[in-house]
């Protein structure tokens, strides 16, 4: 087991234990493990099921790492995801952990922010086949297909006498 130098948002792993990745650390690179996605509704009001995470967790591997979702140009990549783990030890807390490798010589400021803890959060982007609305079940392939509930994502509605928040179920 090579040493992981930094963990992004270790507080956000809850009671879950970060995995032990097997990898060969290269000189001059920073290795960062992070919780990439959980089987819950996230702060962007997107939800991923445990089944979807189990099906797709390996698709993180060999994907580029970007800053602030600047992912249109591969030249803006700041690293690569070299491994991933699916965690289902606690059925109430299913999640995917990733291991990122970043070149400290090429991106010294970014790596220093991670090392110092100044940068301690991350966001995950993905491509979806479609999403469904948590309120009405509308299936959307593009933003043009969104129902009013998703257009006002995060709003609350009374459904069968219960208050329910609108979010996207990602598929």
Would you name each region that the model predicts?
Residues 1-171:
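Signature of dsDNA virion morphogenesis modules
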């Amino acid at each position: 087991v090579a040493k992981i130098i930094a963990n992004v948002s270790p507080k956000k792993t809850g009671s879950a234990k970060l995995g032990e990745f097997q990898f060969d650390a290269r000189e001059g690179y920073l290795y960062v493990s992070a919780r990439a996605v959980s089987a819950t509704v996230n702060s962007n009001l997107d939800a991923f099921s445990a089944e979807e995470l189990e099906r797709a967790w390996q698709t993180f591997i060999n994907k580029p790492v970007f800053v602030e979702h600047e992912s249109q140009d591969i030249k803006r990549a700041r690293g690569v995801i070299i491994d991933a783990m699916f965690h289902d030890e606690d059925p109430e807390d299913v999640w995917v952990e990733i291991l990122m490798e970043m070149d400290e010589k090429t991106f010294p400021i970014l790596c220093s922010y991670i090392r110092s803890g100044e940068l301690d959060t991350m966001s995950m982007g993905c491509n979806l086949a479609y999403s469904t609305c948590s309120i009405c079940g509308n299936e959307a392939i593009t933003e043009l297909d969104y129902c009013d509930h998703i257009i006002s994502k995060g709003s609350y509605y009374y459904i069968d006498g219960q208050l329910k928040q609108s979010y996207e179920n990602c598929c």
